[in-house]
């Protein structure tokens, strides 16, 4: 498979097609946006500074694939990705999260992403170090070899001095190698050992109330270098110790300065921030009520989307080249209700179409992570073969579509509630049913859902 940087916009859309049904225009827009980033990297330095990303505004009802398109694109490109709700933020000066926090969160995600990649690179070395630490706990040197007391040294030092004969050392090494062999064969996984770990203490976290968690984290990080690191001995099985020690030993092998440097570069040049529910902060200007704060959030958002420098605990971060994708249903408000300056910062507008009954059929069958494939995989662990007939799939799609028309339209999310109700009995009885092949056809779907669908009160609560 090609690396992402070599993929054309058409190939990016084809990859997104594996997970998201329809919405071609939205896929096309994001594919062009990320491809332009790769093109920008190939430009001379003076041009690179001038070419800014074209931010995208997605307009469409809930459950049609807005978030999923952005998330899958980030996974495909290996970009740091953050999803935020515009309604979570408050204007500077009000209690709540400031919009600046989204950049800090993106950098944190980027650092963790790069750190995990570097840990993967040194995993083999870390496994060897973990093996040594487990062997130290299984065969402690002091217990493996007897103490030989030298009376002359005792007179000088005033205490006992451990001295080991060559024979003692040979026996110790032989015992250690014997245990190493057993460890590698997996014979000691349930053996209990005692290991020493550094205790992580966050004394400031409990002081700060809701909306001030960021401040608590910053103060904890600031004082973490000054506070003494407490060590605590813990008893655990070898299998558990391996999981605990592996990331600790791997972290010692990686250069955190290089990790931070690469993470900052990745966040600044490849970061994607998805701002959901932007329609909820749009509205006509008003001097009173909640609209004041909404206008304030838009004004606070503007410099970040335009390009500014935000201070984070890892260093300053420029937001000029971060790709912002905003999304909203815009049932009540319109994109023109956003402040004009913010409208201008989202030049690419894409309208996502509501899902049809035929789309629901395709969503159930086609994506690589399709709902029915997930249930088939889950129940196969109990030895149950789950078979969906074509008419069964179409009946589930029909009912989901009808419910969306009658009740609140929640898009493809309705399929999850319908599928869960259809397969509830099988999921419950799976370990005990004698017939391990279950066929889900239209008759089966109707039998499971008919009463609930007909009773509007029931369907409003259950489906």
Curated annotation (Swiss-Prot):
Listed A to Z, the keywords are: ATP-binding, Chaperone, Cytoplasm, Nucleotide-binding
| Biological process annotations from GO | protein unfolding; proteolysis involved in protein catabolic process
The record's listing under Pfam families reads: AAA, AAA_2
Which terms in the Gene Ontology molecular function aspect does this entry carry?
A: ATP binding; ATP hydrolysis activity; peptidase activity; proteasome-activating activity
Q: Which residues bind ATP?
A: 21, 63-68, 276, 341, 413
State the SMART domains in the record: AAA, ClpB_D2-small
Localization, UniProt: Cytoplasm
Q: Which InterPro entries match?
A: AAA+_ATPase (IPR003593), ATP-dep_Clp_protease_ClpX (IPR050052), ATPase_AAA_core (IPR003959), Clp_ATPase_C (IPR019489), HslU (IPR004491), P-loop_NTPase (IPR027417)
Please give the UniProt note on temperature dependence for this protein: Optimum temperature is 75 degrees Celsius.
Q: Which GO terms describe its cellular component?
A: HslUV protease complex
Q: What does this protein do?
A: ATPase subunit of a proteasome-like degradation complex; this subunit has chaperone activity. The binding of ATP and its subsequent hydrolysis by HslU are essential for unfolding of protein substrates subsequently hydrolyzed by HslV. HslU recognizes the N-terminal part of its protein substrates and unfolds these before they are guided to HslV for hydrolysis.
Q: Which family does it belong to?
A: Belongs to the ClpX chaperone family. HslU subfamily.
Q: What interactions and quaternary structure are annotated?
A: A double ring-shaped homohexamer of HslV is capped on each side by a ring-shaped HslU homohexamer. The assembly of the HslU/HslV complex is dependent on binding of ATP.
The name this protein carries in UniProt is ATP-dependent protease ATPase subunit HslU
